[in-house]
Amino acid sequence: MIKLAETKRQSRPFKLYASPWSAPAWMKSNNQLNGKGYLLPEYYQAWANYFAKFLKEYQANNIAFWGLTAQNEPWDGHVPNFTFNAMGWDSSSQQEWIVNNLGPTLESEGFADIKLMILDDQRPLAPKWAREVLANEQAMKYVSGVGVHWYLDDVLPFPFALDQVHEEHPDKFILYTEACNGDKPWDTEKVMLGDWDRGEKYIHNIIEDLNHWVVGWTDWNLALDLQGGPNWANNYVDAPIIVDPSQGIFYKQPMYYALGHISRFLVSGSVRIGLTKDNKLEAVAFKRPDNYIAVILLNRYIFLFENWFIGYLLH
């Protein structure tokens, strides 16, 4: 699939990043892949070595990774009986492992250019986590960015947390590394075919994030079936493409078109520029590498807006 994606990307850069969910059970305090458990300190170096070996094996097959997260949702591993793969870290232990093990190992094995991301968890956690991990000079050296997930964004709508991360660490990027619809316990219908509210929710979140220093946004799933799986932990959710294998067909969801619309106009290397508006439309503007200006607009209201764009040339 990766090779196929590379052939279809045309001239755009193709960036892969990897995210571990759990070390092998025998390396962990609870001897399980899921539930409340932590990486045992005696295996800190072995786990770092695994990262390097993972990258080398892909490299041997002509697949290069752009980035890594240190751990997917490290807070999940603090939750007793957490249902699927997880491993707990706090900011202190993650800093220690990166400084003493992961960072030096990636550097010595020829992967110093890999973009290492910390946190990879919910937005409200980001300011404190980044502040504490990056308080160490060596951690600052090894870490390139902060990964953020969207799952609490509509419950705790605090985009200024992203501003805080940027203001305190302007040389570290912020990347949204995971998002999907149908993830909440109250989402009784996990897959909703043709639901444009879910497409609008994607665009709303992307515009909000881009206006608060986020540099990219990633969906969790490429494609799922009509149930929102397969998923061994019964964690069913929605996806931009839904496949009906019994009929040999697939559906492009509104979320697919939402992502496609933004991706078509907002290309890699674009720089966000200032924008003011006098109505309730959601908007973000970028100057592209080809010097064109791209403006992404979202109208979530039932009435129409008439829009006039005024731009200025700076010489």
Language model features: what each stretch is:
Residues 264, 275-312:
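Carbohydrate-binding surface patches
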Residues 100, 107-117, 141-188, 205:
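Glycoside hydrolase catalytic-domain groove-lining segments
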Residues 173-258, 274-277:
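Aromatic/acidic polysaccharide-binding cleft in carbohydrate-active enzymes
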Residues 27-30, 76, 80, 123-128, ...:
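Active-site clefts of carbohydrate-active enzymes
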Residues 121-144, 148, 183-194, 227-230:
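Substrate-binding cleft/loops of secretory-pathway carbohydrate-active enzymes
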Residues 100-101, 124-136, 157-164, 200-206, ...:
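Alpha-helical scaffolding within the catalytic cores
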Residues 1-136:
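Substrate-binding cleft and catalytic face of glycoside hydrolase catalytic domains
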Residues 16, 54, 68, 146, ...:
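Conserved, mostly hydrophobic/aromatic
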